[in-house]
Regions:
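Extended amphipathic alpha-helical segments enriched in small hydrophobics
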Residues: 227-259
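Polybasic, glycine- and aromatic-enriched phosphate-binding surface used to engage nucleic acids
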Residues: 2-235, 245
C-alpha cells in the first residue's frame, strides 16, 4: 500500500520499497542543495554542419593556408559526445568533433570571427542554406547560439544522457563538449564530483531514481533536471553506500535482487 499523505503520494510502492525510499531521503541531501551546476549540451541548429568526423576535421586542417590558421582552427574544433556515447563509468570515443564557433560571453570573451578561420568558413558555406535560416544561431549564421557556461566545458565534469536505461555517469577531466542529448555536472570542488560519481552510478540510486522519474516504457528513463536534482546524496565520508543509508539485510537483499 501507499500512504497518500506522504511524499510517496504518486508512486505505488510496497512496504519494503517505501522503507528503502524513506531511508535514502532521510540521510541524503538533494542534489539541488549541493554546490554544483547542471547544464545541457550544445544545440547547434544544424549538426551536419557543425558536428564533423575525424576525416572532415583533417580535411579542414589541411585546407588551412598558414600554420597560424591551422593552430587556431585546431583549437576551435573540439571533441563532442552524444547521449548514446555515455556509459556507466566511461564514454565511447565516437571520433566526432564540434566546430565551436561560439558567440562569446558578454564582457568576458569575444565571439568567434569566421574571417579568422577561412577553412572553417569554406566548410560551413557548403551548408549556408541551412545555417542561415536556423533559429538556434548567434550573431551571424556562422556562430553558435549564446552559451553562458561555455567555459565549463573546459572543467572536470560528469556527463549523463538525457534518455538512458540506467543512471550512467562518466567522469571527464578533459576539454570535452556534448550535444543537447547530454547533460553535465560541474563543481568548484572536484571532491564533490568524485563523491557524486560514485553514488550516482550505484544501483541503489538507480532504483531510487526510477521511483521519481518519467519512464519510457520499461526500458528507459528521462533524466529531467527536476527529478535529477531531487536525488538524495549523503555527505562526503562513508564508503559503504548501504551502510550510510541505514539499509537492513532484507532491504539490501531486495535491491540486490532487482534487475535494474
Amino acid at each position: 500500500m501507499c500512504d497518500f499523505s506522504t511524499s510517496d503520494s504518486w508512486v505505488i510502492l510496497s512496504p519494503i520499497e517505501q522503507s528503502i525510499k524513506r531511508k535514502i531521503e532521510a540521510v541524503g541531501t538533494p542534489l539541488k542543495d549541493w554546490d554544483i551546476n547542471i547544464y545541457r549540451g550544445v544545440l547547434t541548429g544544424c549538426n551536419e554542419a557543425f558536428m564533423i568526423d575525424s576525416t572532415k576535421r583533417k580535411e579542414i586542417l589541411s585546407n588551412c593556408q598558414t600554420e597560424e590558421e591551422r593552430k587556431r582552427t585546431d583549437e576551435l574544433i573540439r571533441p563532442i559526445l552524444r547521449g548514446r556515447d555515455i556509459k556507466r563509468y566511461e564514454y565511447v570515443d565516437n571520433g566526432l568533433y564540434l566546430i565551436n564557433t561560439h558567440n562569446g560571453i558578454k564582457g568576458k570573451l569575444p565571439r568567434i570571427d569566421i574571417n579568422d578561420y577561412p577553412a572553417v568558413k569554406a566548410h560551413l558555406d557548403q551548408y549556408w542554406d541551412k545555417i542561415s535560416v536556423r533559429a538556434d544561431k548567434g550573431d551571424t549564421p556562422y556562430n553558435l547560439r549564446n552559451c553562458t557556461y561555455l567555459e565549463d566545458f573546459n572543467k572536470p565534469k560528469l556527463f549523463y544522457a538525457d534518455i538512458s536505461r540506467h543512471l550512467n555517469f562518466c567522469f571527464c577531466r578533459d576539454i570535452m563538449f556534448c550535444n543537447n542529448t547530454t547533460y553535465f555536472i560541474v563543481a568548484e570542488n572536484n571532491l564533490i564530483l568524485e563523491h557524486l560519481y560514485r553514488y550516482l552510478n550505484h544501483h541503489l540510486i538507480d532504483w531510487y531514481y526510477k521511483t521519481l522519474s518519467v519512464q519510457l516504457g520499461t526500458n528507459a528513463v528521462r533524466m529531467f533536471s527536476i527529478y535529477v536534482l531531487e536525488i538524495p546524496i549523503p555527505p562526503i565520508g562513508e564508503n559503504d553506500i548501504y551502510k550510510v543509508y541505514n539499509l537492513n539485510d532484507s532491504e539490501i537483499a531486495y535491491i540486490e535482487s532487482k534487475e535494474l
